[in-house]
């Protein structure tokens, strides 16, 4: 089964570049047993935009919140605006408390430095 996330290689190029491997879970369905292996693809128009190949998850449903664990400290530095996608926020979690440390970009942020034609 294929699950398409709203992230991808523009914010985490490590699986495509280095074959980095991650574990994932559906945040609100942690107690449900896996249904079958799921491949998690990103949203870029690239055949290599796959974040995880065949990970055991419950049957994904629209709106599920996917968590990919321990993606690393360098993802933000490696992220780009490829395909004009805004970069995500960075959230630190400590003792069950979440804190945003970098706000997510908007499309206006991505386009702000473009110079219109004369």
Where are these regions (language model features)?
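Charged (often Lys/Glu-rich) extended helix/loop segments that serve as interaction or gating elements
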Residues: 1-118
């Amino acid at each position: 089964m294929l699950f398409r996330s709203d992230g991808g290689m523009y914010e985490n190029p490590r699986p495509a570049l280095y074959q980095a491997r991650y574990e994932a879970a559906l945040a609100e369905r942690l107690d449900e047993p896996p249904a079958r292996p799921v491949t998690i693809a990103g949203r870029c128009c690239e055949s290599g935009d796959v974040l995880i190949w065949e990970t055991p998850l419950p049957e994904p449903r629209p709106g599920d919140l996917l968590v990919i664990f321990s993606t690393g400290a360098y993802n933000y530095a490696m992220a780009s605006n490829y395909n004009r996608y805004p970069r995500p926020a960075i959230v630190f979690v400590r003792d069950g408390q979440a804190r945003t440390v970098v706000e997510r970009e908007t499309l206006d942020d991505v386009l702000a430095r473009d110079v219109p034609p004369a």
